[in-house]
């Protein structure tokens, strides 16, 4: 985690690691979902020392890319809770695991009306407008600006998927 690089109590640590994988929420990002200058500096310092630094997150690449662009030299991302490993500079996917459309249709048919639908399809994130408009009802107020900036907001995400089912990353 990033805190190993900027720990105030112990100072900078000398570790023989080659990869730093940082979770985003409550690790690399503060409570306002911002990437702090201290963490950007720590990540860039590690990259300058020849380390590979990646975000490892449950988010899709469309919701991670703005943060990656803030860290000079960050190239890779582990997204969708491990469903995808992407070279963000070339778009090459080293790993891309999806859930087949029939399984997603089965789940979606039973979940409609009970959950906030968020579909990760082809590196894009989709959700229903009513969900994004009511993020607070889901305990996700802090995410609303991120969703509005990085999601494809549609009238009804379940209906969109059912009309044109595709493999889903998450």
Residue ranges and their predicted role:
Residues 155-169:
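Alpha-helix-centered segments that form part of catalytic cores
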Residues 135-159:
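Acidic, His- and aromatic-enriched active-site or binding-groove loops in soluble protein domains
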Residues 37-141:
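Active-site phosphate-binding/coordination module
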Residues 14, 70-71, 165:
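Alpha-helix termination/capping residues and helix-transition junctions
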Residues 1-14:
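Short, Lys/Arg-enriched N-terminal segments with co-localized hydrophobic residues
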Residues 17-32:
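Asp-based phosphoryl-transfer active-site loop
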Residues 91-94, 166-170:
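Short, solvent-exposed beta-strand edge segments and adjacent coil->beta transition regions
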């Amino acid at each position: 985690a990033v805190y190993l690089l900027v720990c105030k109590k112990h100072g900078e640590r000398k570790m023989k690691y080659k990869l730093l994988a940082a979770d985003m929420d409550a690790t690399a990002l503060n409570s306002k979902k911002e990437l702090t200058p201290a963490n950007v500096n720590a990540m860039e310092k590690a990259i300058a020392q020849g380390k590979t630094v990646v975000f490892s997150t449950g988010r899709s690449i469309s919701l991670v890319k703005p943060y990656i662009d803030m860290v000079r030299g960050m190239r890779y991302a582990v997204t969708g809770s491990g469903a995808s490993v992407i070279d963000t500079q070339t778009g090459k996917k080293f790993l891309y695991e999806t859930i087949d459309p029939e399984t997603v249709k089965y789940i979606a048919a039973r979940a409609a009306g009970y959950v906030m639908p968020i579909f990760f399809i082809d590196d894009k994130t989709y959700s229903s407008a009513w969900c994004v408009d009511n993020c607070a009802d889901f305990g996700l107020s802090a995410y609303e600006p991120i969703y509005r900036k990085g999601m494809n907001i549609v009238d009804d995400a379940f209906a969109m998927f059912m009309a044109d089912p595709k493999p889903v990353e998450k």
